[in-house]
């Protein structure tokens, strides 16, 4: 959250640190053409939800996170996944995928993964899950700009796609001048 917004909130990589949602404006990153990708002058608001391992409403953190995701229907979800404990975190990822919201995985702690001599095939993980996966380290800032660009592209794509079943007849868009 802090790396993405420039804020200085107390955050951690375990459930219970954040018990309520926090909001911040996401910093903007210029694209290769020098223009800010897809924000078109609009700020993006990032909502930090409590760290959870599932959407089951058994704890206050889970209730807050679940209610926000289901009721507020955010434009997109950035799912922060601990790369040092992938299996435990993918349970929540699968639940979030079932909600059919645009989502990107920020595979965090990749500096620790490398330090431990491990590797994660992010391209294969993205292919298997069907969503973008961006390796990051919130501690070092590695991958944060790429994450922001990927999130901007995801939101832009979600807003520009025609809804399923939406149909325009060419005759409907022309004024009748006869």
What are these regions (language model features)?
Residues 4-7, 12, 62, 79, ...:
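Preference for short coil/turn "hinge" residues that link or interrupt alpha-helices
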Residues 111-165:
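Canonical P-loop GTPase G-domain recognition
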């Amino acid at each position: 959250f802090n790396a993405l917004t420039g804020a200085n909130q107390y955050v951690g990589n375990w459930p219970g640190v954040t018990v309520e949602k926090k909001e911040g404006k996401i910093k903007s990153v210029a694209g290769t053409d020098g223009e800010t990708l897809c924000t078109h002058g609009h700020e993006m608001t990032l909502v930090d939800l409590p760290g959870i391992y599932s959407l089951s409403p058994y704890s206050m953190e889970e209730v807050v996170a679940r209610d926000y995701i289901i009721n507020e229907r955010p434009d997109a979800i950035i799912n922060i996944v601990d790369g040092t404990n992938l299996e435990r975190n993918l349970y929540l990822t699968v639940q979030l995928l079932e909600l059919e919201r645009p989502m990107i995985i920020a595979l965090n702690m990749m500096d620790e993964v490398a330090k431990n001599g491990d590797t994660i095939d992010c391209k294969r993980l993205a292919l298997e899950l069907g969503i973008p996966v961006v390796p990051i380290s919130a501690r070092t800032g590695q991958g944060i700009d790429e994450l922001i660009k990927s999130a901007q592209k995801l939101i832009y794509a979600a807003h520009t796609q025609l809804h399923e079943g939406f149909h325009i007849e060419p005759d409907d868009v022309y004024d009748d001048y006869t």
